């Protein structure tokens, strides 16, 4: 109540922000006449002037009015498009590092130009992130004319580009590309052999188009570069053959389970019942996969249990043409949010292989992670991040909490005239689809175009079949027609046109009422002026006809899990003040209604005694459905937040390793770091056999000599030293051993030459670090997938994960120090030629690895987000050795035992 009263008195925060920015727009408008009087050369000279003023210490913000006036005038001259006032407000929002919510058709592509140009002036680069390669190329070509006119360089990054092209694109002032490509280039750069092999420069400023799609819908799906691991295709096929023998059961209200397994559709998980467990054991025994007397739940057979669960999920929870399609002998995932296919992506936890076995396809080998990150952590690396979309306000809390981004709702240039009708709810899907066909007939009879949004490919093809039966001409747009997508959506506004689209396929292309005449002109070879004029006149007639009839009508065939995706579908109508309308048709058999809608909605409809073909239309029902959606959105947010909390642990470690790697690559001399590492390792080895503050009787001198020969390749007569000098105490002995090892190393360096040795040290450090980091990622995956079991021991899985991950990381760093020292002490470096040969071989190995590697934007299942499931790869994981500490562990914040006076973590506890 008080909040509403305060908002009424002082206006909402959003309204105050818009009011503040309108004052700046007034200043930009005052400059319009002055900048309009400049010649092209004078206008183009503004870029050099702005850069000079920045060099002299002027702030970007103080340049903003003049810069925006320059871009507006240049856009008017080059593209014939003048920025509206609200588009300038959108540009300011982006410059301030926030999200601009602008309705469909408000010209988001043009909005970005002013902010992009302003932030490109310092010369640190601006990344414009789009959802697909087509939009990246289109926008770079379209808006590139404006930027090039103003003297800016524009680049595009795409998959499959040679490194030289990519490097040039990243060196440009403005770089366009997809979220996947930017993310994978970041990972590849951190696997690079040298600084020269990297393609990206610093991550300065990114503007993310369709920011909700990239930062929210795809946030649960990590970017992974992986290499092939061991083949287990026969096991998948054998387990797949068992599934038809198992009977699906139900869980009664008393909690009793029938059948062999039960399904939880909310969490998309399966659970074996007691009888099912016994039946599976008998079947596995018959196939020779389980030995007599062994249990399916024993530690050795957990991977087998995982295979059974994956096969059951593949058969009963994942449907062909809904969750995936089979194309070219491969299972291709269909994005649940956009309806687009996602070639190259694979489900994790062995689920993808189980689906391949179900469909009788060749089973692709499981893989080992070489490098990974999430979009959440990648985009948080930018110094400044901004985004734009038509629908962000429903997710404003998540943008604020995870990315620190505020959402500003930009008012439309013209008031929205679209009418959003209440939902119509039917008892069955059959009745719902018949009602949709009737609605299509009625609306097209008025000469209005219709866009029908479906949630799956299966639904779009079923509707298409019904329309064919009714002899209604239509176009279908789903994941199977990527290439013709833009053309179909551009012509969806013609009078009487019927277009079926899965979710938001075709996003990024406007539906122009009357059709898009520019696309028709572009399809002709050298059209004459008369033809162009005729086509424009025909379009004007069609455009007016559709306007008079009431504009575009949107039909939603079911509600999505997110209100935002429903709003995106509605937003296709009523662009730029055009008339339009929308209505959703639902049934009690729809997924959202069946799984999440409250029982009272179903009971209410049945109590009303509804007859076949009748629908209920009431605001109460619509509100109840929206409440269900909010419940699902909250659940999905919790899952994304959980994933982020776990990935933050890995991200801290990733940051340390990548910073260390970059530091080593950028340096020509890491000898000081190597000396420190050697000293730590020698100290650690000596402590194993001569415990600190111990009596000589407790020393294992013979064991120490053997260990030094094994690890340091040096024979030291320590027993003889002790006989010759009875005053050789522990500290002096440690120093004498270290001096002898250093002297041996220096002698080796004199033979090879200092320059060759410096290069070799650098190569060895990077090679050891890369190998151990890959093993560490496998160990982290393994830990992550089993950590939820700690909950059964009344322990907090997240805290346990942090603790275990830190121990794994410490062990990895200790191992790295030992391995680097061991290799450097054992290898004899002879010449510069030998060094060049080692470098060449390592480069070739990295190239082979990258050629074999797969880039996966892996579809994380609900189980993964919750920390459930096991990947069935125990045999492939590099299990960390138990590290036995002979002395009290020094805390990271305690004084360093070396006596330097610094904290341990800032002294000997540091890698370098």
Curated annotation (Swiss-Prot):
Disulfide bridges in this chain: none
Please report the record's description of how this protein sits within the membrane.
Answer: Peripheral membrane protein
| Main EC class the enzyme belongs to | translocase
An example Pfam family from this entry, by short name, is P-loop_SecA
Q: For this protein, what is the EC number? A: 7.4.2.8
Gene Ontology cellular-component annotations: cell envelope Sec protein transport complex; cytosol; plasma membrane
Region feature Disordered, mapped onto this chain: 854-912
Q: Which residues bind Zn(2+)?
A: 896, 898, 907-908
In the record, biological process GO terms are: intracellular protein transmembrane transport; protein import; protein targeting; protein transport by the Sec complex
One GO MF annotation is: metal ion binding
The answer to whether keyword Chloroplast applies is no
Q: Which domain of life is it from?
A: Bacteria
Query: What SMART domains does UniProt report for this protein, alphabetically?
Result: SecA_DEAD, SecA_PP_bind
What's noted on cofactor binding?
Answer: May bind 1 zinc ion per subunit.
What is its cofactor?
Answer: Zn(2+)
State the compartments where it is located: Cell inner membrane; Cytoplasm
Tell me the keywords, alphabetical order. Answer: ATP-binding, Cell inner membrane, Cell membrane, Cytoplasm, Membrane, Metal-binding, Nucleotide-binding, Protein transport, Translocase, Translocation, Transport, Zinc
- Swiss-Prot/TrEMBL catalytic activity: ATP + H2O + cellular proteinSide 1 = ADP + phosphate + cellular proteinSide 2
Self-association or partners: how does it assemble? Monomer and homodimer. Part of the essential Sec protein translocation apparatus which comprises SecA, SecYEG and auxiliary proteins SecDF-YajC and YidC.
Q: What does this protein do?
A: Part of the Sec protein translocase complex. Interacts with the SecYEG preprotein conducting channel. Has a central role in coupling the hydrolysis of ATP to the transfer of proteins into and across the cell membrane, serving both as a receptor for the preprotein-SecB complex and as an ATP-driven molecular motor driving the stepwise translocation of polypeptide chains across the membrane.
Q: Which family does it belong to?
A: Belongs to the SecA family.
Listed name of the protein: Protein translocase subunit SecA
